[in-house]
Amino acid sequence: MQEVDRLEKLIPVLEKAGYAHHYASGPGKKHGCLVAFRKTQYSLHATKLVRYDDEEIRTDGDINARRGRSFQTRNIGSLIALNDHLLEGRGVVVATTHLFWHPKYTYERARQSGILVREAVRFRSEINCDSWPCIIAGDFNFAPDDAAYSLLVGDPLLPDQEESLLTSRVVHTSVDPTIPRSAAGPVEEQADEAAVDPDKVITSARPATSTDGLLTMPELIAFFSRLPRLRSVYDEGLGMVSDVEGLTTFGSRVKLLAARKGRNEPEYTSYTHYWKTVLDYIFVLNPFNSPSKIKSLLAPHLTTNLINGIPQKGVSSSDHVSLAAEMSWVQDL
């Protein structure tokens, strides 16, 4: 779960239902990420907190250049490893996150998502659990046609995706305090996008220079090429379903080439007055010798049930819908 607050209300409910939990939040934030697990089956083996603002993505330059960030966001990734009581020596690694929300900061979300995968793989290796599957799920704040999604699942970048990355290679005043606030960024089309709305345009930022350390397009592609490709549980699972009446997917409303991944994600995972899109995913990284099988999925909400917006009584208590999957892994001999 992401954007979790009111722990004094939530934790007793989880405990009554037989769940233990691990909670983590960014510095100074009043909400965070929570992973709950059944106490009868799992116990906490190890944890790791990933602070995206502090993570380095290159080895050259000063500390800011090595981090290569465009915005100090205070977002985190929370990694935990769980021992399975029912299978001796087995377990699962779970990573959850809430990436930076601003729709124009495509580069920063790509940076954060790449760091999350890198650190999840590193964490699994550091605790000698390479044979355990890794589930990476959360609110990624990007749609299936976003550059970050394509980079994660191994699709080549399209020209418009490269353009969104290039125009978001900026440095915000939160990283460089010498930048005056409310200075417009280098996105040429901002004049046509209601520039008075800071939630839809880049402000208080300047174009990145080479000394800022932001990855160039070839460097970003190379960064992701060194990472394992993620598999989306819903994209694969819904792609195998054809007998659910009224089921529509992201590809039903957004044209994607047949070869592109993401077309079978739910049509929406968030449906509010301001945002109607897909933001949430369940990804998996399988161990080398243990392929996964999708046994069942929680059916997405029908769009007709979302048109009045969420949260909505009887539909969803959150402005995001729930995603759930039952998975199995079989170890090859």
Regions found by a protein language model. Name each.
Residues L7-K9, K29-K30, S43-H45, G89-R90, ...:
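Eukaryotic short linear interaction motifs
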Residues P12-L14, T47-V50, T106-A110, A147-L151:
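Short coil/turn segments at secondary-structure boundaries
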